[in-house]
């Protein structure tokens, strides 16, 4: 299919903790990766919007008979998505991540509330930063997670109009 053809041509890593092959019950891509910078280990967790099933071409997610072959942990409450993200963050932490940076394609404006980036943060713990996309907005905000801890949430708009930089100060734990 087209997505896998593009992925095969790319040199980039593709991450998504919630893009599932419904036939195999496996994720299509690695859910996260851990990179080491000096003595600091940072996990990058990929999160895909469940709206991919309706806001892109739905035929790409079905077989020839029209049966869904992919899913994004979509449900009416958002709990499936929150559970998968939490499971992935916990696994990354258990595997030695000092910090967790979620790379999301979730958005806020025009997105179902249960799948918004700020809602995912509010229903999980352990994410330090969420760098967002999908809704093509520019924002930098702090959102309280499920434990009441502030998480940096940022999105830089569209078409490289702006760019962002996240700085983690490992000696103080400050993130900006």
Positions of the model-derived regions?
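Acidic, metal/ion-coordinating pockets
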Residues: 1-176
